[in-house]
Amino acid sequence: MKKSLLGLTFASLMFSTGSAVAADYKIDKEGQHAFVNFRIQHLGYSWLYGTFKDFDGTFTFDEKNPAADKVNVTINTTSVDTNHAERDKHLRSADFLNAAKYPQATFTSTSVKKDGDELNITGDLTLNGVTKPVTLEAKLIGQGDDPWGGKRAGFEAEGKIKLKDFNIKTDLGPASQEVDLRCTGNSGHYHLFFF
């Protein structure tokens, strides 16, 4: 259980809403409606879940023109939290996130393409001093009016990253070579929410 890891689910994470008009959005981290989460196999027997507590980001969403969409996210890697202080300390070390040297991870989209009901969001993920392309699949769950007179849209986004792609060489066993990225949430105009 001591080694588990990393994540960056984040990344991911942040994207799509269901507005009919192109608009700029900011991730709502102040209202505790946004989360950057990850999971990784633990010895092939169970899942280890974690989150990053400190992050920020923006995106532009145009339902009619996904090619114009943009996503930018910055994560403070020192904020990793797996509900275990010693493990978190190890994850921040040079064995994994190397947070002292690389205190931020970033995701910057390079393309967004519609694929049936999904949006494929491809971008450059920089983690542990390494930049690699990552694709996230985002799906609109539903949209409509909220009780306060605004518009909301719910979505789910998923992706995977390989540890070795980001120069994370600590051997966690054959079942623990990839980190699953997953975000589910809803968004409103000017804000993006992850639950």
UniProtKB/Swiss-Prot annotation:
Family annotation (InterPro entries): Lipid/polyisoprenoid-bd_YceI (IPR007372), TTHA0802/YceI-like_sf (IPR036761), UPF0312/YceI (IPR023480)
Keyword Nucleotide-binding among record annotations: no
GO cellular component terms, A-Z: periplasmic space
Cellular location(s): Periplasm
Signal peptide: 1-22
Keyword line: Periplasm, Signal
Domain of life where this protein originates: Bacteria
Entry-linked Gene3D superfamilies: Lipid/polyisoprenoid-binding, YceI-like
Pfam families named among the record's database cross-references: YceI
PANTHER family assigned to the protein according to its UniProt record, in alphabetical order: PROTEIN YCEI (PTHR34406:SF1)
Family the UniProt entry places it in: Belongs to the UPF0312 family. Type 1 subfamily.
HAMAP family, per database record: UPF0312 (MF_00780)
Protein name according to UniProt: Protein YceI
Source species: Shigella dysenteriae serotype 1 (strain Sd197)
